[in-house]
């Protein structure tokens, strides 16, 4: 009885497998013999057949001319439709993913269609970064920001859990959240996106207007590397105008190094810091800590005016009319941290005595403290603040004068310097007349890459000695490390003066190292080896 078509097909399949095995057997035995000659190698007992080789072998075993021949022989040709995966385009903020599929063969010679972005981004980091803020494969969403200003952000639990122990506990811990939408009202959307971008790609993009919010987000989710980057960014952008605000934030975030850097700026540039807009935005505990500060380099009259400005702003924040009574109320004990008796009598009479924030009894007692032999007890500290002690970097080993003494002729004496630690340049020490007492008019300048940072036009009197005489800038100027700055002095007065000799290219002053080099601005002969500008006066 003839076999059914299905049986014939089955027999053909078995025959084909047997023939294939017999064809491959001699070649396999040869390989085994060759492998036995090399005992260090593992014997290979399999062969991977490529698709083209399979087709050629089948053609040799079963030569078929066309489709009609197959039909006559009774064989069934199965045509399996190729499965195609429809990939929807992804809406994405930061990157677009090309989703046109490409076909490749895997190790089993199966055709596999893959999205083109896999091959276009060969590294794991690139592919991971592509998923940032991307709906594709997202398994969680965050509603970030306060109501009315929130933003929906897609994310991937695994990526976040790997980068943050907080997210790991949130998604995979014992108290894992099952909600697909997680609300985070206390984080700004821009800061949250910066956090996520770092977690997906190791890229950090910080800006002055978002760095504090980013630091908060990094602290909240314990992403320490990003938090350190934020602190470093804040330290490099720290200035007198933002020092008080950053001090307040550093105390909130418990960042002691940043707090110390803020204090350095506030102490050295106290007047600029207290008169900045940011000072009125600080909280009361930070205000009190500033008023407790012994090292503020500022007049007490400036401190008092700054306190009044803060009280006015605080009244408005609390919805109060800024009357003297309300100002006194919001200040509380902070008012009694102002050292009113340390002002001069003239400063007190022209300022604090004419402001109603003090009671009549307080004003009367302070006037008596100034004038009476028996001092009344006061509710205010009476000792002036110590301030900072200025340091001097002297760059010459000796000074001299001869018949051809140094001459001031209205020309520019200039020198360049750099430091290895941030300092605040307060002024210059200059040589005076070698012929007795003399008065000089002087203009001093501080520049960086040709940009004027500070200048002052003033006078000083020399006594005929070889001592240096200080000339101050209006405010100390912050000087960053590892950058060259130029200081200049133009003097008019007695022509003959002392001059420095045996100049040093490097000088160690406490914990700060100064380097000096000649300046092209110098037209009066001053250089590294000799000339004028013997001293830099600074705070560190």
UniProtKB/Swiss-Prot annotation:
Keywords: Cytoplasm, Developmental protein, Differentiation, Neurogenesis, Nucleus, Ubl conjugation pathway. One of its GO terms (biological process) is regulation of neurogenesis. GO terms for cellular component: cytosol; nucleus. Disruption phenotype: Morpholino knockdown of both isoform 1 and isoform 2 leads to a major decrease in the expression of neurog1 and downstream markers of neuronal differentiation. Knockdown of either isoform alone leads to a mild decrease in the expression of late markers of neurogenesis, but has no detectable effect on neurog1 expression. Expressed in the developing central nervous system. It is found in: Cytoplasm; Nucleus. Residues 138-208 form the BTB domain. PROSITE patterns: BTB. Transmembrane segments: none annotated. CDD domains: BACK_BTBD3_like, BTB_POZ_BTBD6. It comes from the Eukaryota. Adapter protein for the cul3 E3 ubiquitin-protein ligase complex. Promotes the export of zbtb16/plzf from the nucleus to the cytoplasm and targets zbtb16/plzf for ubiquitination and degradation. Up-regulates neurog1 expression and antagonizes zbtb16/plzf, to promote neurogenesis. Interacts with cul3. Interacts (via BTB domain) with zbtb16/plzf. This is BTB/POZ domain-containing protein 6-A. It comes from Danio rerio. The lineage of its organism: Eukaryota, Metazoa, Chordata, Craniata, Vertebrata.
């Amino acid at each position: 009885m003839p076999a059914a078509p299905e049986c014939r097909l089955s027999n053909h399949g078995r025959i084909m497998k047997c023939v294939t095995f017999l064809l491959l057997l001699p070649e396999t035995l040869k390989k085994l013999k060759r492998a036995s000659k090399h005992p260090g190698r593992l014997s290979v007992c399999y062969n991977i057949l490529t698709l083209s080789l399979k087709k050629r072998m089948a053609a040799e075993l079963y030569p078929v001319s066309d489709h009609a021949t197959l039909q006559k022989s009774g064989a069934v040709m199965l045509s399996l439709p190729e499965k195609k995966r429809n990939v929807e385009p992804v809406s994405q903020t930061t990157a677009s993913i090309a989703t046109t599929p490409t076909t490749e063969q895997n190790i089993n010679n199966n055709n596999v269609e893959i999205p083109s972005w896999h091959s276009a981004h060969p590294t794991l980091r690139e592919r991971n970064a592509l998923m940032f803020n991307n709906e594709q494969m997202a398994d969680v969403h965050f509603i970030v920001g306060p109501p009315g200003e929130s933003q929906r952000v897609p994310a991937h639990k695994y990526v976040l859990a790997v980068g943050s122990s907080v997210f790991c506990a949130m998604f995979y811990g014992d108290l894992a959240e099952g909600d697909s939408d997680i609300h985070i009202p206390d984080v700004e959307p821009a800061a949250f996106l910066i956090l996520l971008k770092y977690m997906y790609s190791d890229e950090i993009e910080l800006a002055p207007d978002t760095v504090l919010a980013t630091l908060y987000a990094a602290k909240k989710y314990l992403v320490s590397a990003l938090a350190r980057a934020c602190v470093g960014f804040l330290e490099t952008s720290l200035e007198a105008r933002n020092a008080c605000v950053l001090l307040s934030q550093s105390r909130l975030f418990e960042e002691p190094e940043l707090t110390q850097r803020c204090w350095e700026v506030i102490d050295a540039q106290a007047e600029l810091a207290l008169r900045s807009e940011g000072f009125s935005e600080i909280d009361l505990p930070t205000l009190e800590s500033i008023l407790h500060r012994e090292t503020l380099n500022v007049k007490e009259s400036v401190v008092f005016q700054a306190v009044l400005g803060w009280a006015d702003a605080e009244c408005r924040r609390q919805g109060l009319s800024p009357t003297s009574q309300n100002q006194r109320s919001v200040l509380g004990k902070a008012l009694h941290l102002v050292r009113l008796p340390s002002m001069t009598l003239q400063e007190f009479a022209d300022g604090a005595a004419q402001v109603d924030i003090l009671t009549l009894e307080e004003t009367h007692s302070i006037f008596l403290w100034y004038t009476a032999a028996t001092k009344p007890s006061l509710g205010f500290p009476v000792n002036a603040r110590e301030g900072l002690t200025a340091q001097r970097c002297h760059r010459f080993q000796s000074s001299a004068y001869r018949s051809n003494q140094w001459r001031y002729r209205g020309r520019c004496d200039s020198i360049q310097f750099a430091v290895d630690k941030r300092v605040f340049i307060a002024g210059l020490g200059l040589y005076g007349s070698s012929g007795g007492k003399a008065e000089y008019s002087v203009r001093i300048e501080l520049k960086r890459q040709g940009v004027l940072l500070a200048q002052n036009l003033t006078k000083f009197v020399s006594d005929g000695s070889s001592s240096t005489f200080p000339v101050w800038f209006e405010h100390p100027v912050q000087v960053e490390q590892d950058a060259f700055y130029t200081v200049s002095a133009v003097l008019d007065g007695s022509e003959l003066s002392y001059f420095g000799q045996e100049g040093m290219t490097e000088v160690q002053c406490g914990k700060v190292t100064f380097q000096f080099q000649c300046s092209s601005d110098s037209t009066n002969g001053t250089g590294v080896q000799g000339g004028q500008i013997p001293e830099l006066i600074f705070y560190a």
